[in-house]
């Protein structure tokens, strides 16, 4: 073998090694914002917000204008992870100690059984018992809070007492005082995504923004100085999240992960009007009410899917859709087994790829407390 042949052969082997190192299935990052109003992204109609990274996600993906979550956090998250309407998922109100029934199959379990590494970074809020926690529901790794909210720096829950600390790594309580929760989320995402590039990952980033307590960066408080409160505080927190989204996308590109990673973005429910968020701040436009309500402003949420390699870019879909649809949609896009899959959701792939297709839903079901 001469030198030229050796170089060509070696180069071919190296190239083959690089190709083989790429996961056969796409990575997935499912981003769930918290109490994010129906229209509180520029591309969804807000006129006073700066959200360049969420807007870029829509420019490079498909944006849904008639998309639904649930009136409150736990109900929304249970339906998201099971692909089932609230009553069937087993949660019709916010979770306390008891939460998502362990016998329900979650999207994380489906991903894991098909060879994915799985992580939940951020907020669980589907029960505080360890035997029904994230590690028991399909997540290889969990870093975040088990309850509904914490102070973003101390990671204590301050409301009505007792003041409980809530920060966990898997089933071990940890402490990270003084470190901003969402910033720590991003560090954990970066570590998990790069631990093993030979296997695909599924990361559920349940970020707790713009949920109270409203603790935005000074940069954005200054930017929105002319907005009246509570809109100013809320808007600054939304833009704080937008910065972290931009940092995530920059990281994915730098690591060579962007092309093969599906990004899904959605809010859990409408904006809060609770006293802890100064009775408002969010924007639902023509849609009545907000969080805790069955009216449109409580359940209609912004939603985007972005995978430029395979899906349309800069397109809008007005078809009826719901968070339960992400389960079958991601299973189809990732080429996973659908055997014994028990979901109420419908794959959005036909609608995503062809805007002329009709919604597969005739009726959506919502349950929350005594509202249904």
What positions do the PLM features span?
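Formylglycine-dependent sulfatase
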Residues: 2-14, 20-372
């Amino acid at each position: 073998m001469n030198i030229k042949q050796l170089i060509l052969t070696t180069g071919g082997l190296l190239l083959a090694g690089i190709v083989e190192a790429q996961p056969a299935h796409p990575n997935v990052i499912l981003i769930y914002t918290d109490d994010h109003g129906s229209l509180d992204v520029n591309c969804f109609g807000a006129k006073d917000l700066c959200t360049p990274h969420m807007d870029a996600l829509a420019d490079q993906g498909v944006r849904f204008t008639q998309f639904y979550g649930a009136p409150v956090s736990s109900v929304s998250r249970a339906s998201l992870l099971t692909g089932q309407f609230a009553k069937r998922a087993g949660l019709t109100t916010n979770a306390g100690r008891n939460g998502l029934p362990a016998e329900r199959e979650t999207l994380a379990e489906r991903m894991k059984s098909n060879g994915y590494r799985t992580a939940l970074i951020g907020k669980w809020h589907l029960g505080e018992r360890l035997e029904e926690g994230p590690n028991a529901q399909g997540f290889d790794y969990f870093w975040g809070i088990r309850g509904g909210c914490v102070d973003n720096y101390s990671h204590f829950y301050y409301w009505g007492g007792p003041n409980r600390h809530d920060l966990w790594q898997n089933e071990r309580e940890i402490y990270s005082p003084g470190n901003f929760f969402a910033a720590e989320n991003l560090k954990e995402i970066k570590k998990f995504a790069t631990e093993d590039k030979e296997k695909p990952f599924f990361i559920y980033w349940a970020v707790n923004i713009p949920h109270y307590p409203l603790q935005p960066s000074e940069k954005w408080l200054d930017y929105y100085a002319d907005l009246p409160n509570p809109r100013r505080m809320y808007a600054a927190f939304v833009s704080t999240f937008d910065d972290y989204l931009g940092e995530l996308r920059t990281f994915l590109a730098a690591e060579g992960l962007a092309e093969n990673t599906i990004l899904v973005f959605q809010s859990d429910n409408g904006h809060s009007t609770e006293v802890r968020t100064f009775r408002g701040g969010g924007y639902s436009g023509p849609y009545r009410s907000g969080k805790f309500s069955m009216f449109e402003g409580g359940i209609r949420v912004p939603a985007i899917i972005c995978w430029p390699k395979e899906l349309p870019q800069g397109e809008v879909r007005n078809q009826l859709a719901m968070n339960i649809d992400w389960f079958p949609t991601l299973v189809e896009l990732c080429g996973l087994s659908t055997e014994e899959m028990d979901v109420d959701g419908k794959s959005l792939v036909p609608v995503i790829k062809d805007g002329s297709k009709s919604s597969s839903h005739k009726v959506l079901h919502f349950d929350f407390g005594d509202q249904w």
